[in-house]
């Protein structure tokens, strides 16, 4: 396969050194070195990592590798990889593609990897290395991050730098790595190196599935990883993908990651699982399988967790031990242990193209699809504490999972992101070691990921930009669970998520696959994953996925958050049982993404919640992104990080608060990056609170970003943020925190509403002091709240921002999904519930809560529901009254919300969880939301979906269902405003886990109003928890939002009550808490929403049993009261549309014209512009490759080379025409060739010569020169360019020729000759006739032009080259007569366009313009060519001189020039005809010509030009059609006429050029 730049792996595959150089540059180690000296290699690749450990492993491994036998796995890899050069790549050069088997074997031999060795290795490594290895590895891992060495984590992994993923944590993983290492080089390198090429190959597939999952895994995956790392220098991370959990026996190889990832699952608990994701393909993020069950597993987890160095990562995270401390144990720390493996992480290499397709994941059955779908990789940590996140750089960046916890740094692939990362970074510092990963914030590129976080935090790396691959894996507590869940999830579309579900307890995974859909959505990558937490506290997290497709904005933040909360917590808080962490990372692309995110939120609900009631389980993830879409999603992206800091607070709410504040502040900056939020539910309330707040804030900021509010707004916009987390903590403060959180959420809703919310928020905040600080970002409220309770401030702040972001808010709801796992048992714990309520989006909460009632009617029931749990509370949710504190939180009034109320709130909260459970409630909410949302219809869908799930069942079941359903629902919701839906889902999830799980927020209302309602509902749950007040506030503020009330529902059932009950009650409104009464506005809104819901989801099947029933069912249609649009209305709209569209069209035209003008000017420049210089530099490498290829061709296949040359120079007569053509072709050097491409008969060679650097190029046809052409064809062609004047000159090849391949343009190649510092396009494939593609002798394209002619689609096309020249030649040579021959060149161009390719780019415009004024057009055409401007300019000058007598030489012009000689002489004639004849060609020609010029240009330029040409094409085509050919055929204006005779082809070729020139 050819490299994009024209190099072919095949050329270097056999030579390891060459291959290595090819892939990585000579400085990289050869594969041999890598294999043999793991330490060295690592150092080379990963300087930072702790090689020490690696070495040990490495040694161990190396010996094994020594054995030559290739492993089976490798063999199968070979097969996969074989056809692709990518395969060939690899750190070492493996065998050539020609001998793929050899390559693999070679690698294996070098590495001494044989089946036996692998087995031995596994045995040896596993036992001894298991944990220990990890630790040593971890040091490496951190460093790896950068290098992608993360792999180091496992010593062995370290061995091969390439695979980070490999890192099995443990020895075994190590083994894996090693194995992988060896193969990796082959495989990986191949894959990686070429990731682009290979992508499809899908290392992942390669991964072996050997039973010894580890070993097998490693083979493939590491390789992949390695490849990634190696292959792309840029991306070190790539290697990462492979992650090996340590499972000594990985039972399953889990699935292959689509691309490179590999999964290994551990058979034994102890075994590490290897989960590697495909590093290569981002999308393939692998999945994780975690299969382990035992604590041991946990260990493995640790390993995995490390993202890069999985195990190491953990350690790096914070613990030396390598396993994330917490993790290992933590993993197990709690139930987690059981679900230890969790990491899956996939690394996408940013830079590499991902094989998106890969996704094949054979992933374990479990997850196979899910991950694949989303490209994003998520890391999930199974263990809360452990969470070491796998940081993964989503793409480029490498993850630095630094060994140090604090160290997380995010590497972003992009500079910008990097900056952001730094910013983010700081929060991490705060956090403890868990630096938040910084999302690259705004990065536009998805790549950035930041994640960074060391193990501490969980990071979810963003997925890549790719759309998606996310993978999440969350193991359930029990490994088994996971699988189950996975399986279920897979069903989901997005499937990304695995739900964890099995046990409701423990960690449910909540990932929502919803994401998957999101992926669909495109942006969304969301693949959030939740880590379920098993134990009460374990939390996991992650959820979020960045939806951004485009945006990388992954939220690392969340990670940080998570890290902070969780991880950090875990580190620090490990103490706290509730280590749970949630990560939410959401990115929300504003658009679809946001929605997707929402779903995320839903998933969150899955939070295991602790059925137990443990607060820990919160998952929080919310899709905040939804809103962001509305708002500026991007913002949200980066910001969230701050949250990470929260964790520190865990100890005490207040204490935490300050940290939070700190974090938040960063947050605001991050704010833009807002979406992600992480909620961690620390065991203790405080931490939870903090997290929550932070997350809230995060949300806010995001939202804010939308809004002016700096801090808050972003958060708001981040709908994704999820808040939720509540520890069961008994502490009042903790509860307060939760409340605050709730409040925050509520406020958030309020925010959207406006200040009112703020006030309440403050109160809420008070309880949550921690949050307060976080809220600080939202400056406005912050202060007030801050004082009393930090939380409040944030909340309040949030509210303000929210209002503006209101709409966003709506979307945000999903993020709501608070996971509250709040423990139902403890009232205080309720707090967590509150968090849930948080529902950031008011709406969402409603959905989850009674809010679901959101639709007017539903709400009431909700309320009742809430009531049942706590009579007062339910009301509270609705109104502040129900719980003073809640109320306060809810709104300013809520301010009163005091800690005291908090307790009740807490209690309520639990119920709320249940409330969320209630399907009914959620459904309504959903309805509600939808209505408000602009896209009401969709919402309805969402609602329905949600509903089903909720109703579906008791929490656990519902949860699961939800997951499944949710995705669609969520998705829907998102769109519709579906936020609510998501939230609901989450709610139900939460409930499932625990009654308290409290609601998820239901989605937010799509529209601002709806949002308000949503918010209101959220408050309700909060209220129940203590959020209720919020609700009211929201209601008030969002009176329009009516839905807010819905939230109340959450409160609805007592924690104790089964969700089922609540569920049932939901509609009935289990118990209405009359206490809280929504404001009139809220009630009114509620009714409207109810009605809207009724109308949107009418019961059209049952008869009207009574008048009352009929009235009840029909009355809601009043919402549709109003007149249908009248014809005049339609007319008016049409007129407006026409006006706007016309204006837009004009602007577009003006822009295009301007661009063309610029191009023209550029083409006329004598000296290259900075742009051209830059392009030259960019393409120099490619050019070198092309030259090498040409030389090789000339040496190896002179005949071919000559023939192409000849084509170019085919007829000497054509010479004149050729000149013209050549001008073009030579221009392109290949262009002529291309033109000639039709090697057919034109032996004539077209030579374009640039007189001076800027001088006009002269084109000559060398009839006799054919040989010259062939030998020189490329160089000669270039020469020709130089020797333009001398027909024979072409034969000299003194100028080197570069060939550019335009990726955008398929099959287009440009050849540029560099002369006197100028580049000339000798050959432009674009110019070649369509059939010409054969000119393939791209190298000889120039020479080929003549041949091209034959291909010219139309004879004219052929003539294009020939004719082209001929027409011009007519005067000069036999342009016309020859035209047919000449066409080659022109042909090429024309061909490209339509056989008018050469002239096409310029031709199109030129053609059009040219019709009128041929002479002028040429100049223009040149301009068009500007892409090739530089060369073009020189040639164009020539061309002009010749054709127009204008000086503009253009590479294309060179063709034109060639024609110029002839063309110029006969310029006028052909063009006209040509245009006509070449009409189709013209367009192509136009484009084509662009190509040649493009050749000169850099790819970028070319692409710009191409775009323009494409735009122009339609118009240009018509006008240019004949013209293009004419242009091709002839030089610009004049030549066209000449060409005209042959018009078609000649025009195409020269004309095309000329035309281009003229046109330009």
UniProtKB/Swiss-Prot annotation:
Region: Disordered, residue numbers: 53-99, 624-688, 723-949, 974-1028, 1049-1075, 1215-1300, 1324-1424, 1440-1560
N6-acetyllysine: modified positions: 1057
Entry's localization field: Nucleus
Key word Transcription regulation present: no
GO cellular component, as recorded: chromatin; GBAF complex; nucleus; SWI/SNF complex
Modified residues (Phosphothreonine): 921
InterPro entries linked: Chromatin_remod/trans_coact, GSCR1_dom
Keywords: Acetylation, Disease variant, Intellectual disability, Isopeptide bond, Nucleus, Phosphoprotein, Ubl conjugation
GO molecular function term, any single one: transcription regulator activator activity
UniProt biased composition (Pro residues): 726-736, 791-806, 814-831, 843-880, 932-941, 1331-1356
Biased composition (Polar residues): 1227-1236, 1485-1515
Taxonomy, superkingdom: Eukaryota
Tissue: Expressed at moderate levels in heart, brain, placenta, skeletal muscle, and pancreas, and at lower levels in lung, liver and kidney.
Modification Phosphoserine, positions: 919, 1413
PANTHER family according to UniProt: BRD4-INTERACTING CHROMATIN-REMODELING COMPLEX-ASSOCIATED PROTEIN (PTHR15572:SF1), GLIOMA TUMOR SUPPRESSOR CANDIDATE REGION GENE 1 (PTHR15572)
Pathological condition linked to this protein in its record: Coffin-Siris syndrome 12: A form of Coffin-Siris syndrome, a congenital multiple malformation syndrome with broad phenotypic and genetic variability. Cardinal features are intellectual disability, coarse facial features, hypertrichosis, and hypoplastic or absent fifth digit nails or phalanges. Additional features include malformations of the cardiac, gastrointestinal, genitourinary, and/or central nervous systems. Sucking/feeding difficulties, poor growth, ophthalmologic abnormalities, hearing impairment, and spinal anomalies are common findings.
Protein name in UniProt: BRD4-interacting chromatin-remodeling complex-associated protein
Organism of origin: Homo sapiens
Name of the encoding gene: BICRA
């Amino acid at each position: 396969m050819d490299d994009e730049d024209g190099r072919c792996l095949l050329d270097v595959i056999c030579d390891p050194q060459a291959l290595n150089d090819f892939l990585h540059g000579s400085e990289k180690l050869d594969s041999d070195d890598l294999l043999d000296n793991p330490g060295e290699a690592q150092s080379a690749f990963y300087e930072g990592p702790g090689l020490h450990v690696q070495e040990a492993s490495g040694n161990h491994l190396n010996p094994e590798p020594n054995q030559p036998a290739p492993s089976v796995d490798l063999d199968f890899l070979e097969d996969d990889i074989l056809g692709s050069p990518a395969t060939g790549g690899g750190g070492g050069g493996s065998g050539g593609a020609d001998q793929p088997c050899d390559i693999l074997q070679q690698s294996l031999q070098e590495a001494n990897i044989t089946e036996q060795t692998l087995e031995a290795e596994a045995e040896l490594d596993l036992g001894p290395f298991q944990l220990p290895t990890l630790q040593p590895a971890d040091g490496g891992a951190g460093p790896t991050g950068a290098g992608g060495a993360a792999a180091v984590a496992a010593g062995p992994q370290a061995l091969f730098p390439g695979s980070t993923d490999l890192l099995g944590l443990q020895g075994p993983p190590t083994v894996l790595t090693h194995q992988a290492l060896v193969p990796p080089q082959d495989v990986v390198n191949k894959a990686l190196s070429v990731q682009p090429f290979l992508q499809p190959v899908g290392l992942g597939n390669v991964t072996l599935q050997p039973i010894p999952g580890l070993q097998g895994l490693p083979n493939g995956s590491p390789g992949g990883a390695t490849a990634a790392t190696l292959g792309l220098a840029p991306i070190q991370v790539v290697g990462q993908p492979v992650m090996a959990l340590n499972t000594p026996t990985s039972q399953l190889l889990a699935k292959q990651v689509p691309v490179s990832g590999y999964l290994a699952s551990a058979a034994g608990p102890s075994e590490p699982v290897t989960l590697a994701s495909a590093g290569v393909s981002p999308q393939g993020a692998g999945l994780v399988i975690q299969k382990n069950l035992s604590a041991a597993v946990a260990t493995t987890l640790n390993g995995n967790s490390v993202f890069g160095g999985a195990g190491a990562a953990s350690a790096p995270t914070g613990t030396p031990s390598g396993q994330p401390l917490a993790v290992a144990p933590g993993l197990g720390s709690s139930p987690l242990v059981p679900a230890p493996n969790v990491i899956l992480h996939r690394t996408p290499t940013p830079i590499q193209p991902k094989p998106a397709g890969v996704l094949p994941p054979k992933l374990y059955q479990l997850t196979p699809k899910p991950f694949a779908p989303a490209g994003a990789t998520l890391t999930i940590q199974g263990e809360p504490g452990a969470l070491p996140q796998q940081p993964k750089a989503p793409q480029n960046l490498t993850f630095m999972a630094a060994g140090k916890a604090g160290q997380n740094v995010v590497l972003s692939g992009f500079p910008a992101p990097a900056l952001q990362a730094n910013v983010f970074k700081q929060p991490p510092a705060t956090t403890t070691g868990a630096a938040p990963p910084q999302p690259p914030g705004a990065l536009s590129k998805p790549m950035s990921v930041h994640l960074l976080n060391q193990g501490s935090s969980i990071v979810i790396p963003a997925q890549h930009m790719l759309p998606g691959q996310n993978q999440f894996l969350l193991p359930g507590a029990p490994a088994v669970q996971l699988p189950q869940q996975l399986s279920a999830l897979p069903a989901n579309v997005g499937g990304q998520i695995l739900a964890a579900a099995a046990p409701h307890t423990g960690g449910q995974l909540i990932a929502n696959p919803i994401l998957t859909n999101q992926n669909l959505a495109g942006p969304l990558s969301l693949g959030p994953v939740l880590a379920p937490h098993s134990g009460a506290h374990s939390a996991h997290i992650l959820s979020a996925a960045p939806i951004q497709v485009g945006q990388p904005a992954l939220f690392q933040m969340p990670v940080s958050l998570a890290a902070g909360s969780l991880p950090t917590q875990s580190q620090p808080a490990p103490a706290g049982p509730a280590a749970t962490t949630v990560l939410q990372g959401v990115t929300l692309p504003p658009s679809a993404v946001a929605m997707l995110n929402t779903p995320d939120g839903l998933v969150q609900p899955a939070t295991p919640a602790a059925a137990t009631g443990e607060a820990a389980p919160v998952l929080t993830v919310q899709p905040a992104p939804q809103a962001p879409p509305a708002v500026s999603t991007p913002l949200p992206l980066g910001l969230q990080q701050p949250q990470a800091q929260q964790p520190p607070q865990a100890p005490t709410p207040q204490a935490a608060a300050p940290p939070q504040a700190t974090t938040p502040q960063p947050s605001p900056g991050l704010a833009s990056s807002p979406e992600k939020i992480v909620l961690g539910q620390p065991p203790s309330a405080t931490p939870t609170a903090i997290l929550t707040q932070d997350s809230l804030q995060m949300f806010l900021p995001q939202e804010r970003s939308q809004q002016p509010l700096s801090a808050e707004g972003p958060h708001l916009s981040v709908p994704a943020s999820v808040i939720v987390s509540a520890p069961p903590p008994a502490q009042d403060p903790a509860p307060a925190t939760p409340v605050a959180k709730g409040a925050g959420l509520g406020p958030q809703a309020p925010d959207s509403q406006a200040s009112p919310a703020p006030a309440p928020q403050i109160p809420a905040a008070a309880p949550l002091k921690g949050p307060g600080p976080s809220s600080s970002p939202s400056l406005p409220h912050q202060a007030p709240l801050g004082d009393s309770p930090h939380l409040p401030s944030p909340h309040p702040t949030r509210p303000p921002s929210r209002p503006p972001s209101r709409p966003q808010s709506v979307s945000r709801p999903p993020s709501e999904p608070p996971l509250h796992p709040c423990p139902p048992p403890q009232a205080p714990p309720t707090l967590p519930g509150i968090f849930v309520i948080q529902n950031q989006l008011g709406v969402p909460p409603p959905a989850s809560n009674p809010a679901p009632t959101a639709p007017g009617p539903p709400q009431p029931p909700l309320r009742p529901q809430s009531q049942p749990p706590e009579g007062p509370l339910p009301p509270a949710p609705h109104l502040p009254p129900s719980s003073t504190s809640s109320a306060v939180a809810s709104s300013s009034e809520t301010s009163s919300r005091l800690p005291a109320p908090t307790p009740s709130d807490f209690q309520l909260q639990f119920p709320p969880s249940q409330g969320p459970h209630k399907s009914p409630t959620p459904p309504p909410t959903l309805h509600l939301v939808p209505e408000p949302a602009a896209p009401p219809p969709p919402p309805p869908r969402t609602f329905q979906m949600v509903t089903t799930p909720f109703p579906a069942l008791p929490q656990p079941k519902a949860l699961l269902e939800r997951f499944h359903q949710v995705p669609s629902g969520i998705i829907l919701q998102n769109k519709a405003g579906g936020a609510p839906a998501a939230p609901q889902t989450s709610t139900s999830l939460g409930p499932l886990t625990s009654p308290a799980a409290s609601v998820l927020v239901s989605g937010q209302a799509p529209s601002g109003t709806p949002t308000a309602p949503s918010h209101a509902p959220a408050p309700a749950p909060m209220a129940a928890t203590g959020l209720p007040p919020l609700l009211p506030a929201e209601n008030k503020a969002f009176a329009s939002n009516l839905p807010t009330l819905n939230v109340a529902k959450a409160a609805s059932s007592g924690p104790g009550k089964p969700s089922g009950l609540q569920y049932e009650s939901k509609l009935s409104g289990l118990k209405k808490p009359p206490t809280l009464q929504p404001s009139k506005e809220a009630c009114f809104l509620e009714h409207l929403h109810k009605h809207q819901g009724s109308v949107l989801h009418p019961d059209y099947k049952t008869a009207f049993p009574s008048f009352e029933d009929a009235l009840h069912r029909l009355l809601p249609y009043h919402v549709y009261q109003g007149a249908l649009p009248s014809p005049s209305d339609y007319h008016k709209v049409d007129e407006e549309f026409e006006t706007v569209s016309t204006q837009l069209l004009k602007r577009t035209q003006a822009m295009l014209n301007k661009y063309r003008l610029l191009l023209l000017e550029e083409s006329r420049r004598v000296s290259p512009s900075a742009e051209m210089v830059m392009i030259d530099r960019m393409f120099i490498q490619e050019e070198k490759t092309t030259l090498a290829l040409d030389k090789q061709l000339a040496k190896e296949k002179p005949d071919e080379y000559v023939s192409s040359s000849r084509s170019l120079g085919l007829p000497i007569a054509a010479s004149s025409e050729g000149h013209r053509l050549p001008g073009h072709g030579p221009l392109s050097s290949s262009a002529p060739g291309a033109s000639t491409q039709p090697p057919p008969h034109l032996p004539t060679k077209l030579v374009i010569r640039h007189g001076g650097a800027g001088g006009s190029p002269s084109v000559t046809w060398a009839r006799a020169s054919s040989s010259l052409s062939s030998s020189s064809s490329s160089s000669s062609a270039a020469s020709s360019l130089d020797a333009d004047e001398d027909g024979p000159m072409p034969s000299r090849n003194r100028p080197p020729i570069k060939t550019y391949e335009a990726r955008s343009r398929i099959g287009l190649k440009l050849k540029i000759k560099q002369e006197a510092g100028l580049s000339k396009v000798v050959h432009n494939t674009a110019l070649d006739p369509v059939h010409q593609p054969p000119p393939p002798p791209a190298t000889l394209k120039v020479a080929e032009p003549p041949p091209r002619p034959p291909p010219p689609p139309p004879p004219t096309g052929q003539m294009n080259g020939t004719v082209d020249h001929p027409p011009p030649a007519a005067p000069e040579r036999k342009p016309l007569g020859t035209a047919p021959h000449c066409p080659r060149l022109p042909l090429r161009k024309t061909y490209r366009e339509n056989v008018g390719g050469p002239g096409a780019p310029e031709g199109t415009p030129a053609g059009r313009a040219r019709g009128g004024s041929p002479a002028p057009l040429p100049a223009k055409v040149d301009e068009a060519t500007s892409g090739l401007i530089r060369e073009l300019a020189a040639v164009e000058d020539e061309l002009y001189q010749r054709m127009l007598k204008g000086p503009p030489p253009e590479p294309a012009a060179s063709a034109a020039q060639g024609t110029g000689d002839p063309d110029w002489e006969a310029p006028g004639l052909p063009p006209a005809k040509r245009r006509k004849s070449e009409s189709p060609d013209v367009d192509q020609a136009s484009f084509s010509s662009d190509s040649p010029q493009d050749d000169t240009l850099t790819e970028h330029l070319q692409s710009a030009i191409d775009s323009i040409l494409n735009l122009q094409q339609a118009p240009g085509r018509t006008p240019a059609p004949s013209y293009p050919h004419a242009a091709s055929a002839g030089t610009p204006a004049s030549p066209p006429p000449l060409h005209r005779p042959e018009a078609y082809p000649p025009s195409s070729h020269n004309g095309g050029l000329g035309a281009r020139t003229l046109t330009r």
